[in-house]
Amino acid sequence: MDLDVVNMFVIAGGTLALPILAFVASFLLWPSALIRIYYWYWRRTLGMQVRYVRHEDYQFCYSFRGRPGHKPSILMLHGFSAHKDMWLSMVKFLPKNLHLVCVDMPGHEGTTRSSLDDLSIDGQVKRIHQFVECLKLNKKPFHLVGTSMGGHVAGVYAAHYPSDVCSLSLVCPAGLQYSTDNKFVQRLKELQESAAVEKIPLIPTTPKEMSEMLQLCSYVRFKVPQQILQGLVDVRIPHNTFYRKLFLEIVSEKSRYSLHQNMDKIKVPTQIIWGKQDQVLDVSGADMLAKSIANSQVELLENCGHSVVMERPRKTAKLLVDFLASVHSTDNSKKLD
């Protein structure tokens, strides 16, 4: 989501080295432009480079740092209506000797948006596989990370293309079938039944709705200035028609439970990370996955909501690095036996 932007004042005012008047003018008059500058600045600071690659007439946009080496490359898949830059808060705490690749999911940010594109979970899995083959990322198995919708896609990808993936991190993934619905899912079903697609909580159209979405997705209660809320809305509004189409596709009967239907096919070592106070996707999904994936481990984070990467970037990065180290050392031991 957009939670990492809320700390931008300290960053922009203290380290961007922009004249104070220019900063104030941008804040008051063009908050959406300031948000774009924020992401540009952090990519540059963290050494993340943006590139494009094509599969036939389809363009993928991605950022990367480092080069493939003896450690597995890491491919990161963001959630619904986010973009590759949502990982920056976590990238900050990852070792610079890791090869990181963050891709814009189909239709998001710099990746092609086509009315003909299959936005179902299976369709997105196929697109990500095309991206992987374009970069030859699967020349040797890589580590796949996904959060929310991206976790849904990542889990199904690991089931469909097992030889591509050496290990998997699922961060509060969507795609599971619960015995009872939480309040958020109940509300979504009511909206679907009434055909009120304009009121989807994850697609805000006003600063007030943006504030409500941030509260829904985060355990921490940030006090976000009105101008920044407006900027976040301004950035998203041109894409809301696409977001609605995508949302209806991924909650359709074809896609809604794709991870649930494929989780027993996941054979690689799997890390499951979930915020205990997640109001979007119930934390009981972690136990559900652990019971179906033989080689898995669960990490539940206290005082953390759905936006795990934004709320607990340092902790999430440490869990990821520790998990990779344990899997990698185990693989090396097996080779020596």
Curated annotation (Swiss-Prot):
The chain crosses the membrane at residues 20-42. The keyword Phosphoprotein does not apply. Keywords: Endosome, Hydrolase, Lipid metabolism, Lysosome, Membrane, Mitochondrion, Signal-anchor, Transmembrane, Transmembrane helix. Its EC number is 3.1.1.23. The keyword Isomerase does not apply. Residues 1-19 are extracellular. GO terms for molecular function: monoacylglycerol lipase activity; phospholipase activity. GO terms for biological process: acylglycerol catabolic process; long-term synaptic depression; lysobisphosphatidic acid metabolic process; monoacylglycerol catabolic process; negative regulation of cell migration; negative regulation of cold-induced thermogenesis; phospholipid catabolic process; positive regulation of lipid biosynthetic process. Residues 72-313 form the AB hydrolase-1 domain. GO terms for cellular component: AMPA glutamate receptor complex; GABA-ergic synapse; glutamatergic synapse; late endosome membrane; lysosomal membrane; membrane; mitochondrial membrane; postsynaptic membrane. It catalyses: Hydrolyzes glycerol monoesters of long-chain fatty acids; 1-octanoylglycerol + H2O = octanoate + glycerol + H(+); 1-decanoylglycerol + H2O = decanoate + glycerol + H(+); 1-dodecanoylglycerol + H2O = dodecanoate + glycerol + H(+). The active site is at S148 (nucleophile), D278 (charge relay system), H306 (charge relay system). Residues 43-337 are cytoplasmic. It is found in: Late endosome membrane; Lysosome membrane; Mitochondrion membrane. It is a single-pass type II membrane protein. SUPFAM superfamilies: alpha/beta-Hydrolases. Lipase that preferentially hydrolysis medium-chain saturated monoacylglycerols including 2-arachidonoylglycerol. Through 2-arachidonoylglycerol degradation may regulate endocannabinoid signaling pathways. Also has a lysophosphatidyl lipase activity with a preference for lysophosphatidylglycerol among other lysophospholipids. Also able to degrade bis(monoacylglycero)phosphate (BMP) and constitutes the major enzyme for BMP catabolism. This is Monoacylglycerol lipase ABHD6. The lineage of its organism: Eukaryota, Metazoa, Chordata, Craniata, Vertebrata. The gene is ABHD6.
